[in-house]
Amino acid sequence: ADADAGSVDKLKQGAVRAMLRHLRGELSLHASAVAIGKRSALFVGASGSGKSTFAAYLGERGWPVLADDVAHLDQSEDAFLVQPSEGAHFLMHDACVALGIAPDEERVKTRVAVKTVGEASKLAAMFSFVDDDAVRVTRVAGYEMIQILSPCVARFVFDEPAALRTDLGRLGTLLAKVPLYRIGRPRGFEHLAEVEQRMLEVVQ
């Protein structure tokens, strides 16, 4: 019952909240996010790229998790804030084992406890996970930024040009204020600590 309640809460705080925000012209991204002191970092990537696993790893390291798979962003003067939306965090079995968490053998994904925070955090940097033969962090510039982030927008209206213009306008404002980096790493959990170190060098 607890897992079912957690799934419902995750849906409410994630997809349902994102839908209502999108209808109001607000921005949510398919992403995970973690608070780093008084700032925050956001992570995007294809399904299975490790966004949730990395957020859970950072949570285990003591950094509060703001979002698991949907991050809600609000503009505040010259910055963007990540609103907390983490109600339940779910991981695949192999990720649980790698993080030393006992997996729920009766379910495809296991609900895990992570450190959370109740207030919004200023977004310092965004990172896009890609496969590479070593851990590398490079700044993304130009139209490639839109190419990376546009598919990550939580959209629920697809056939209205005005809605698309609003989405692109929000993305443009976001990218003008918050840097986007590509973070390459080999597949596997043994590189999580190095990825954390390189990320912290950018954010802190």
Question: PLM features: residue spans?
Answer:
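Conserved lysine of the Walker
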Residues: K51
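Short hydrophobic/aromatic-rich motifs at helix boundaries and adjacent loops
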Residues: D2-A3, E26-L27, R139-Y143
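Walker A (P-loop) phosphate-binding loop of P-loop NTPases
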Residues: G48
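Glycine-rich, often acidic-flanked micro-motifs
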Residues: S32, I36-G45, E60-Q204
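Pre-Walker A adenine-sensing motif
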Residues: L20-I36
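Post-Walker A alpha-helix
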Residues: F54-A55
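Charged, amphipathic alpha-helical linker segments immediately N-terminal to NTP-binding catalytic cores
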Residues: A1-L23, M199
